[in-house]
């Protein structure tokens, strides 16, 4: 089945191998995929893990959102993704800490014996000014996910400077946590 999936993806043998190797590891994985827009990052992850996703969300483009309500719109969209994957939460989270707590609740209701793939696409778009997004992501990873052998968190984005500054070169809670 993995071979059939990989055949649909042309010219990405190394990336496919790396992602499948990470998937097979018996430890928590925080994988960061970044690069220019429209080069197939999202397609690669969705094709490889489409039947293994425990949660998938794509950030809303801030260029098309209006004014002060950007964070609220991002949280509403994240909540919709939680519900789509079976969350029983009754209200839209009012903060990213609440949103990631709702994600933890969703994942804890799922089969803990199988690898849980969490894919957050266009991650930089979720980090609006004063939203506390990076702090909440750090809390999710360090406070919960990093202690779960079955978690594979894949984040993706085309804002390479944001990815580099906030994740790969992070000197805070995500320092040296990413693959």
Q: Which residues does each predicted region cover?
A:
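Phosphate-binding site recognition
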Residues: 1-179
């Amino acid at each position: 089945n993995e071979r059939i999936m990989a055949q649909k993806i042309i010219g990405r043998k190394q990336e496919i191998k790396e992602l499948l190797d990470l998937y097979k590891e018996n430890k928590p994985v925080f994988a960061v995929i970044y690069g220019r827009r429209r080069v197939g990052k999202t397609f690669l992850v969705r094709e490889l893990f489409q039947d293994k996703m425990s949660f998938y969300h794509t950030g809303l483009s801030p260029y098309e959102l209006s004014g002060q309500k950007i964070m609220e719109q991002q949280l509403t969209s994240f909540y919709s993704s939680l519900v789509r994957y079976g969350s029983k939460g009754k209200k839209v989270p009012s903060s990213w800490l609440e949103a990631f707590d709702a994600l933890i609740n969703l994942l804890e209701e799922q089969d803990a014996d199988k690898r849980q793939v969490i894919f957050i696409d266009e991650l930089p778009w979720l980090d609006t000014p004063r939203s506390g997004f990076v702090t909440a992501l750090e809390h999710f990873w360090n406070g919960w996910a990093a202690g779960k052998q079955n978690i594979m968190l894949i984040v993706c984005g085309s804002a390479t400077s944001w990815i580099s500054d906030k994740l790969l070169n992070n000197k805070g809670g995500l320092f040296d946590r990413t693959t």
